[in-house]
């Protein structure tokens, strides 16, 4: 065994460091860069970026130039003996020429230094039952170099390259070479927990791994007898269990915290992300095969968990990696790639695993059965207004339509009531009523003859129910795993399928539950029954079989229903996957589209709708399976060729032709993107004609015959009065409503209308009111000519011609600014001040005439109360801040008994002073406060405060302001003068007492019966 230089060995895989970086003698890369406070000014963003690059380059330098020794067998005792050597000079200062004495002392220090980095050139002695592959040994060396330099990282090898084994070997290295056996914490998905325990026993039996799972009694026993006394090396648990026992786990100081499938913490605000950040640990390691699933912010969340002092601001990170900043800037792209190199190791199978044959994917296009076509049409017809662009487009409604269409193309029996019965039978109709099932049946027969074993993935657990019935009918032995499968049953099913000479032919799984961390390499065929929205999930599913240990070529068959939503989902996923290849494999970290927009969903729904409506019969092919697969391979090659021609910009815009002729907005030769602003545009799908049978329309015949045989003469009635469109907020003269009431009563008299009895009052009172109403009808008379002229004149005397929307603007203006600030209301409404003043005078005099006067008045008074409260808070804050010359350093808060343990006094002082500086009455003040907290240099390592939301900061500030008001002992009076509802009612009642006649109508428009 020959001695290797550590820098050459480590640089082989994970990073390309610059050999010209100045030499460093320390192992702490953070000492290489002055940790000067980061400015909160946006203008300093570039400087912060330069600092980040400098820090990461120094990390990379430490990884490549650290001291190393070759591992030649079992470790020796390397404890330091004697006194430690003294160091002269300033730590980290290597810019000046050394004196001879300094150089001698440094050489002596290097000679007696024992904490060397161990470099492996073959599988370590503590790994049993097999040998690690070369690239896995290099991965172990990379992990060891991270630990040696006190740096956390992400092991992001492609799925199936043995990330679990590399991690286990790293923990073995900690035990056998670093004498740091425990405790280590491994947090994994529930589906892979038992697999991790088995892998520890298989590869490194010297490590004592304990599994923490079970009910409360079982958990408490493990915690009491094993975890808290630290009688273990590694604790393996699940995400859910981690949240349940977080209090006990916080009591330990962990050597390593390792999170498998680390994209589970891509949302830094999730409960799991917050909890794992609160654990104490020396090192952290994230394991994921898909470090970038949707956008760069998720990658920042992972890096922030590993290195919160380096990756502090998500806003800065997002802006540096934005599309605009990176477009056409090759130098910036290369430097950004350098940022990630020290922390992220990413390798793909084609580069490192030559013995594993590449998987072959074929897209198999199928038709619709007659029943599928009928149900697909029903779903489209139910929401035809959405499809034709005439209805209200809501994202939740669109997603619901998409999900129903996906159920149609999978199997119509997913809808309740679709399956014929009772009695319900399991026979040929289960296959014939679904195009995918017809092809699946042919495929499975072929694979059974070939001796292959099959994995079937679907999004729908109820689809697995149908597949179970199908397997029972065809006498196929199978295993099943979905999100509701108990942990013990999962382990038993995987072991039964992977057992030597297993007779299990099919393993059916839901994509999300079975696509993570499960080794099913004994299967060589993967069937994607329906595709996931996220193409990474399908890749993870395929790699359950396409992984180390696979001896055959893995074939993947993706079932797609032609001219349906399936095709659009696949095209969207393909484009997203191509973009991911550009981003990850080339080191390009620009942001990809995260979620489906409304336009994408509408396009998916519309795709193929006319073909579905036009045809009536089944379009399932009768070809044999070999012919179907030949056509599928040709079509797959064509699609791959088309996608390969698309450049990155078109991928981001979801354009599927390099001449931009066809986009997701393209349908039947027209582009509806340009017509989106025109409402319906010219888009219209003609629904299928409804076919009616005339055999049962006897009732209609007799109805027409009776109408023809008994002609009735039309009664002469008074013409229906033409009532004007009047609104209560326009404040017409009261006399107008009296005349309108007379007109209505006379019309009711002419048609013989009988007054209805009120239902919401006691019987006697109801009878009395009915009699009074009927008396008014009986005594009614038509309007005289003079009254008609008077009515016409009164219709011209409205206070305003405002619409309902403008009136609501006026009410909101009073609520926002107060009834006295008419100038601000006028600016808000963009109306002349004189007009607002004139209307406001009438409004407050006659507000009781409004139909919902109490609601309007209450709304305004609540707004004025908020104004008064803001004024009181401002006055209290002004008085408190004025007591100190330097309030950010000197301000004291009298907590009394309300101190609490969540926020420190320094944090509270900053919140109060910064809120006062920004202005408590300012809109979005707490969002600005949140940004100030994140930019404040004194809180750069205060993860708790930096992770608070604007709402949480608002609640804390409200508590502090209450304490300050109590401390100041003042009752602050507000400037606005509030007129109460009671006072206004008295004023209106006084005006009404002067008028007489029929009570005025409050309805917007009187409608005679």
Swiss-Prot record:
| PROSITE patterns for the chain | HELICASE_ATP_BIND_1, HELICASE_CTER, SANT
Enzyme Commission numbers on file: 3.6.4.-
Compartmental location: Nucleus
One GO-annotated biological process of the protein? positive regulation of transcription by RNA polymerase II
- Note the Gene3D superfamilies from the entry: Homeodomain-like, iswi atpase, ISWI, HAND domain, P-loop containing nucleotide triphosphate hydrolases, Tandem AAA-ATPase domain
What broad class of enzyme is this?
Answer: hydrolase
| PANTHER family per UniProt | CHROMODOMAIN-HELICASE-DNA-BINDING PROTEIN 3-RELATED-RELATED, SWI_SNF-RELATED MATRIX-ASSOCIATED ACTIN-DEPENDENT REGULATOR OF CHROMATIN SUBFAMILY A MEMBER 5
Full protein name: Chromatin-remodeling complex ATPase chain isw-1
Q: Which gene encodes it?
A: isw-1
